[in-house]
Amino acid sequence: MDVKEQTRKAYELFGKGDMETFFNDMIDDNIVWTFPGKEGVHPLSGVHKGKQAMMAAMSKIPAIWPNFHLKILDMISEGNKVFVRVHATADNMDTMFGHYFESSVEGKTKVMMTFDDTLSMFNAMKK
């Protein structure tokens, strides 16, 4: 499976809510997920090191952004790297995100950096 296929499968699992398979099959134990911004300002901001930290951060999404969905628009890849342009929707949110990934030799995501529309996310947050 090449990095585009791997990435597409990860988005499918995330979209179906199959987080067990998503984390077990697609995410490296030592993943580093960077969500730019000062930690604590945005609910997802910071550098999340390891699968458990990523799970804890992602578990906030359904309560803060009800009906959160991502749809891949397109992808570009080079070697073990892929960048995805995503249509992101939730209650009161309709925007675009960019997501960068690097895969391990084992075919799991080891690096993730999100370039999300934080203003739209803040405006849509359920408080």
Could you describe each region identified by the protein language model?
Residues 1-127:
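C-terminal and inter-domain tail/linker signature
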